[in-house]
Amino acid sequence: MGANVLIMAGGTGGHVFPALACAREFQARGYTVHWLGTPRGIENDLVPAAGLPLHLINVSGLRGKGKLSLLKAPFVLIKAVLQARRVIRQLKPVCVLGFGGYVTGPGGVAAKLSGVPVIVHEQNAVAGTANRLLVPLAARVCEAFPDTFGASQSRRTTGNPVRTELFLETPREALAGRKARLLILGGSLGAEPLNKLLPEALAQVAPELRPEVFHQAGKNHDEVTAERYRAAGVEAQVQPFIKDMAQAYGWADLVVCRAGALTVSELAAAGLPSMLVPLPHAIDDHQTRNAEYLAREGAAFLMPQRTTGAADLAARLTEVLMQPERLDNMAQAARRLAKPGATHDVVNICLEVAHG
């Protein structure tokens, strides 16, 4: 067994999936990977399923909490730091790599107190609270999007680690002589505004121009979304989940979705044009900043939810569906932004820090 590495990531798939990609790379290089998480996050399902040992500490977020919770917060955080420090003393990792989530703050402090180098990776264009607080303690700071952390000698722009199978190598089937294919992603829990907006918008696109539609509506949202399409007179395949994202991306010519960091990175990896509707109440409006990264380079349209109605979306869809060459140009722009070496680069940075 090789030396230990400790990964800290929790809460959402946006933190956990890039961390899993790095875990696999560490393992391929002979390292033993352990994971630090919290009892309530998605890591409790994904990490054991990946065959990785999961260590838990008790910590949660502070935003929006009542006065009593805020009074207790220092004691909760101190306890979490002590829990994390026990794990670190037991494992003696050569480095600790944090991807965000509530676990990252106490875990990073514990690593620093234990003399173990800390590396931070931020997936979004706006850094999360835990990662921002850890920057002064970190030996290196990796960012997916340029200038997330500003000028710093410890900063490295790496991109987001994504699954290698998403970097599509086979050319996409030419649009000539067939209908375009539209992929709509609502996320695992469903983006209800998109589930309502798309059937209405597609009904306003001329039938001869209307694309084939595959709509991932989210858990418990597929039946009502399918009924909306039927009522609108639009043919669509609606599913709650997509098991094979590489296949779905390979099928699509255009994607409508939110602008989570991982989604934006996957769109670039797959070389797909997109219409991005950022989640309007995302913390620090980070999804808008993520979307701007693709939109600035001509790879996506940024369509704010508050100002985008069915008629607006229908007009934009009609515009690009009438110009296949524009979709091609957007796809090429997306591909130029892809970072196929992100996983390799993040792991290299960790090992350079760990071994000097």
Swiss-Prot record:
UniProt function note: Cell wall formation. Catalyzes the transfer of a GlcNAc subunit on undecaprenyl-pyrophosphoryl-MurNAc-pentapeptide (lipid intermediate I) to form undecaprenyl-pyrophosphoryl-MurNAc-(pentapeptide)GlcNAc (lipid intermediate II).
Top-level class of the enzyme under EC nomenclature: transferase
Protein's cellular compartments: Cell inner membrane
PANTHER family in the cross-refs: GLYCOSYLTRANSFERASE, UDP-N-ACETYLGLUCOSAMINE--N-ACETYLMURAMYL-(PENTAPEPTIDE) PYROPHOSPHORYL-UNDECAPRENOL N-ACETYLGLUCOSAMINE TRANSFERASE 1
GO cellular component, as recorded: plasma membrane
Record-listed UDP-N-acetyl-alpha-D-glucosamine binding positions: 12-14, 124, 163, 188, 242, 261-266, 287
Cysteines paired by S-S bonds: none
Keyword Cell division among UniProt keywords: yes
InterPro entries, per database record: GlcNAc_MurG (IPR006009), Glyco_trans_28_C (IPR007235), GlycoTrans_28_N (IPR004276)
Main subcellular location: membrane
Species in which this protein is naturally found: Pseudomonas fluorescens (strain ATCC BAA-477 / NRRL B-23932 / Pf-5)
Membership in a protein family: Belongs to the glycosyltransferase 28 family. MurG subfamily.
UniProt-recorded name of the protein: UDP-N-acetylglucosamine--N-acetylmuramyl-(pentapeptide) pyrophosphoryl-undecaprenol N-acetylglucosamine transferase
CDD domains per UniProt: GT28_MurG
EC number: 2.4.1.227
Gene3D superfamilies, per the entry: Glycogen Phosphorylase B
